[in-house]
Every structure is written in structure tokens, then in C-alpha cells.
């Protein structure tokens, strides 16, 4: 079955770093291949935790790219190694998934544009959220501040993945080119 089950989400960008998260369906360690060339011919691979199996997770991959240049456009693709884990040191990579889609982002900096959008109280109301995302994609801000209350309650990781990485909207890659900065609200802290 499919290992990667969401588009990437850019998170918490800065002049010299960018976070990228995506959802998985089984034990894996995710990675990002990034570079300044659109075809990634200059690509560098960065794993969750920096190593192949140290940041194994069955739900969400979070990769932090560091040492980036300010005000620079980078191209990237996500991937994940499927990991079999017995116990202790009984673990091995048993497969790989790397979608072909290449996305891009621009780091913050003096030469980068500096406008943003704010959304809040989205509460998993998908029809309204889809309209908001459509407008955000039309405007094309340098970032979006998601100012809390993504839902009514987030009681488990499955709900969190749906609220943030897999919203029920047609623009499944809504955050693959525009970074989001989260500010949790009172509803995000319940459960």
C-alpha cells in the first residue's frame, strides 16, 4: 500500500532554514531532496533526524533543512524509506517511495517579498477552508500564519493528520509552496 499519503507542508520558514512535514501510513524515515536547480541535479538529501533509521515514525515525517541561503528559491521532492522494526536493533529498510512531483519555496530574507496571510478558527469546516485556501493561493503570500483552532478537538494523531496534513479540500498540496507558521489555539490543545 502507499507509504506517503499527503502532500508536503512547508513549515516555520526562516532566512536559512525551512521545515517540511508529510504523512505516512507505516514505519518510515522521511527525507527531502533539495537544491537550487529545478531538476534537482544539484540535490542534497536530508533525512528526519539526519540518519536513515533514527527518526522512524509511523505517522508524520518532519525534516528541517538548514544552512540555506536567504532570499533564495529552492526546489524539492519528498520521499520515505519503509522500515521493518522487530525490536531493539532489529530494523531494516524494506522499501522506498519517492513521488516524482518537484515543488519549490523561497527562503525569507531582505531580498524576499514580505507579506503574509492569517487564517484562524478553521475548525475542519472544509467548504469554508477550501475558499480560504483558494484565496491564499491566488494572493501568493510569503507565508501563512495559521492562528489556531484548526479543529474542535484533536484527540489522536489521525485527527491531527486530517486537520493539518490531509484536509478534505481539492488543493491537497496547498502548503507545498507557501510555508505555514502555526500558533495553537485553545481547541488545538484539548484531547
Segment roles from a protein language model:
Residues 111-132, 137-191:
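Active-site neighborhood of divalent metal-dependent phosphoester/pyrophosphate hydrolases
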Residues 1-118, 123, 134-140:
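Acidic, histidine-bearing metal-coordination/catalytic regions of metal-dependent phosphoesterases
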Amino acid at each position: 500500500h502507499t507509504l506517503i499519503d499527503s502532500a508536503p507542508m512547508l513549515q516555520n520558514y526562516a532566512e536559512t532554514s525551512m521545515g517540511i512535514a508529510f504523512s505516512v501510513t507505516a514505519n518510515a524515515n522521511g527525507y527531502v531532496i533539495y537544491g537550487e536547480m529545478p531538476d534537482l541535479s544539484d540535490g542534497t538529501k536530508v533525512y528526519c533526524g539526519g540518519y536513515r533509521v533514527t527518526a522512524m515514525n509511523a505517522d508524520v515525517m518532519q525534516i528541517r533543512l538548514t544552512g540555506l541561503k536567504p532570499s533564495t528559491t529552492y526546489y524539492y521532492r519528498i520521499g520515505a524509506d519503509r522500515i521493518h522494526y522487530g525490536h531493539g536493533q532489529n530494523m531494516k529498510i524494506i522499501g522506498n517511495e519517492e513521488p516524482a512531483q518537484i515543488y519549490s519555496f523561497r527562503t525569507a530574507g531582505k531580498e524576499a517579498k514580505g507579506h503574509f496571510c492569517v487564517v484562524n478558527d478553521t475548525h475542519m469546516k472544509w467548504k469554508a477552508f477550501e475558499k480560504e485556501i483558494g484565496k491564499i493561493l491566488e494572493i501568493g503570500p510569503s507565508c501563512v500564519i495559521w492562528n489556531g483552532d484548526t479543529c474542535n478537538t484533536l484527540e489522536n494523531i489521525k485527527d491531527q493528520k486530517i486537520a493539518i496534513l490531509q484536509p478534505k479540500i481539492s488543493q491537497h498540496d496547498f502548503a507545498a509552496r507557501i510555508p505555514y507558521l502555526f500558533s495553537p489555539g485553545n481547541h488545538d490543545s484539548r484531547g
